[in-house]
Amino acid sequence: MKAALAGKSSTVASAQADWNARIRAVSPASVDAPFVSNHDMARARGMLRSKVPNEKAAALLYLLMPGVPTVYYGEELGMSGSGSDENKRLPMVWSSDAATQCKAPAAADQAQRLTDGVAEQDSDPDSLLNWYRQLIALRNLAPELTRGEMTALDGGNDAICAYTVTDAGSTVAIISNVSQKDTLTVSLDVLRGAELLGGIGGAAFADGTANLPPLSGMIVRLP
């Protein structure tokens, strides 16, 4: 989340690759379960300063990581909650109509600040909910991401997170730009001859070069 806030993600890949290697050294069959929030910690929205672009940047990074990313309910909407455990477990916001929500835990001392629920965000193509949907669909194009071995790449810019993931002889590269203002290009020898599987945020790929608008990413399969 620090990388998402700062718009600097170049060290994320190397740190995650090192972590995955440490896991496999202990248990070769294990897979990581990346997350940014769960029921025992303050919700990601508060830590990301309640700004949707920051939330999108964090999701862009962790939902394309190797392993089995875990989304805590309501995170994909931007639900808030911190302090006592009950505040972190407030009812799902299905719509702006309070009648659609369950009762809050009895000991909760915070009210849910989010007003736009599933119903409202569902019809907004730029909503956080639809961003999560697009990222999950993108991830599903690369089965290598579940159990593959991760290797960090140097994307040439602090805002670029780049790495490869290899499983069963097949390798994909993930390249993401967490800058919220700069369009960046990435040209690496390893990308020559690669095939674009899919992208998000207007990312484009041609002749071994990734063109990445602010908050965008892609997956390519290497030859």
Give the residues covered by each predicted segment.
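Aromatic- and acid-rich polysaccharide-binding/catalytic face
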Residues: 1-6, 32-42
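Glycan-processing catalytic domains of CAZymes
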Residues: 1-27
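Short, conserved catalytic or adaptor-binding loops enriched in Gly and charged residues
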Residues: 23-27, 153-154, 189
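Residues immediately flanking
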Residues: 38, 77, 177-178, 222
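A residue-level signal for conserved active-site and pocket-lining positions in enzyme catalytic cores
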Residues: 39, 135, 215
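Beta-strand-rich binding/interaction modules
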Residues: 182-201
